[in-house]
């Protein structure tokens, strides 16, 4: 999506997504300095959920989601090969398999207001904010699809087959 600002990545949006369409993005590191991912600005209060479907690309690459606030930004780091939350701060984090190697990665119930929503990949698991310290070797990549911001009190997305839509 062109609304997302790129940082040290190239984005190719023609890969098979969890819903079977060719709308997933491949985020590939350019090797440039700085956070390796994409971000968009949102002014939100606390209590939000950030979700993104992610899939492992290069071996040993971790996916991450962060809501940037300037102080103790809520974030979560996900191992996309072992389906585990490696690290999180100021949120409830979870990872759920949805098929074909894809995972629904969630950063929920944030305790701080946020001004940016970021998604990316890294070679390490961090000891602080991924946005401030992520680094991904040039050419390594992850797949991402369906990033969105939700109110935490609304619960998860529910499939309604009677509508004819196909949601994961």
Task: List the predicted regions and their residue ranges.
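Extracellular and organelle-lumenal recognition/adhesion modules and their flexible linkers in secreted
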Residues: 1-168
């Amino acid at each position: 999506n062109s609304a997302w600002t790129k940082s040290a990545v190239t984005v190719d949006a023609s890969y098979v997504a969890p819903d079977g369409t060719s709308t997933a993005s491949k985020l590939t590191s350019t090797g440039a300095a700085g956070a390796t991912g994409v971000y968009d600005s949102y002014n939100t209060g606390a209590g939000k959920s950030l979700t993104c479907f992610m899939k492992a690309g290069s071996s040993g690459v971790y996916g991450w989601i962060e809501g940037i606030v300037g102080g103790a930004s809520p974030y979560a780091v996900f191992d996309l090969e072992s389906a585990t939350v490696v690290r999180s701060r100021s949120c409830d984090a979870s990872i759920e398999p949805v098929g074909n190697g894809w995972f629904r990665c969630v950063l929920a119930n944030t305790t701080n207001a946020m001004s940016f929503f970021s998604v990316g990949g890294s070679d390490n698991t961090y000891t602080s904010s991924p946005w401030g310290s992520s680094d991904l070797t040039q050419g390594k990549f992850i797949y991402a699809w369906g990033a969105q911001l939700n109110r935490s009190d609304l619960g998860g997305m529910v499939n309604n087959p009677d509508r004819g839509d196909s949601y994961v």
